[in-house]
């Protein structure tokens, strides 16, 4: 089965921080992954 949204969020941050570099990396990854998480949850509610 798919991981929980929280698990997917953590995995997103890990992948993002591997791909990104720099001081802003952690905050930018957090914003990107939170946005993605909200969009996924929003779609699930609409379905």
UniProtKB/Swiss-Prot annotation:
Purpose of the protein: Inhibits protein synthesis in animal cells.
Protein name (record): Ribosome-inactivating protein luffin P1
Keyword terms: Disulfide bond, Glycosidase, Hydrolase, Plant defense, Protein synthesis inhibitor, Toxin
Catalysed reaction, written as an equation: Endohydrolysis of the N-glycosidic bond at one specific adenosine on the 28S rRNA
Residues at the site labelled Cleavage: 2-3, 45-46
Lineage: Eukaryota, Viridiplantae, Streptophyta, Embryophyta, Tracheophyta
Record flagged with keyword Hydrolase: yes
Gene Ontology molecular function: rRNA N-glycosylase activity; toxin activity
